[in-house]
Amino acid sequence: PFAIILFLSENLTPSVLTSARIYAGGADYRFELEKFPHLALLTTQANVFAVSDSAAAAGAVATGQKPNNRTLRLEASPAPLPTLLELARKSGRATGIVTNTSLTDATAAAFYARTSDPLDFQAIGLQLVESSDINVLLGGGAADFLPETKDGRRKDGRDLMLEMRNKGYDIVRNQQEMESTPLWRAPKVLGLFNMGQLAYADQVQVSASQPTLPDLVLQAILLLQYNPKGYLLVVDAGLAGKAASQNAGERTLREIASLDQAVAVARKFAGENALIVVAGKQNSGGLRLNGYSFRNDKGAAILGINAQGVPSLTWSTGPGSGQTTTPTGISHSEPSAFATASS
């Protein structure tokens, strides 16, 4: 294939996909990603633990070998394994990373960085600048590239954005600048559209000044398609996992729908000679769909208590669940999609 586009997201479980599908259009609705000719289930255990964390799951996808939890690509093998992006570059392909979280977040970083601390965002940003030959980088996380004197959080005083400009990258900070980039030059582009992660799909006022995930995917395709040997684009739809970790039910479902819109963009604009893969990493929050919503229910109709007095959606674990493995009950006094189950 000329184009290879890999979408990654947390919470692509049957329960969450079913909930998001019903929310988006009812029980008979189908997501674009559900129309693919091939569907499969996959396991995501880490090297030691039966349940993977985000960094280990992303590292497994990036290299094909399961690393340890709480590390970024520290595999069992003694030598670092090449990532999919590195292999793509060696074959002459252009490469890109798109994320609606930060470019230094674990999923995006798994494709270019290697560290024992996936939360050391400043060091990860440095690895991106010092070793990256990635053609297109679009997402959030500008604070990890700027010194404190420029409202960033780098304590070493380095302006990594300036360093990337000196390496030949076009720097874009908003949607207008991104869409004004001359495509015919096939430039290297670093787009940083917020100091932290990008806005959620339901944050209309904030997101109006930022590109959405479908916007980012379209721009990346337009930039990468000029390479005569094709390209590999990795898309991290990370906000679904961020929302789920906070038990934000409707927000989680809207982020899954946003991912599907980005998949639809890829299918439309990548051309017929394209391989598009959508893969889940791990599940956060344990969202469950209970009975019995009606077949035509959609949107807010599935967010509260159903006719039997049972929450349509419940969570297995809630914010702070990293400190406990004991689930607690759901409070029926709250809208179930927003109820927490943390201790």
Predicted ranges, named:
Residues 1-19, 61-62, 66-69, 75, ...:
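Mobile, glycine-rich extracellular loop/lid and propeptide segments
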Residues 2-4, 12-18, 22-59, 105-343:
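A post-motif C-terminal structural segment
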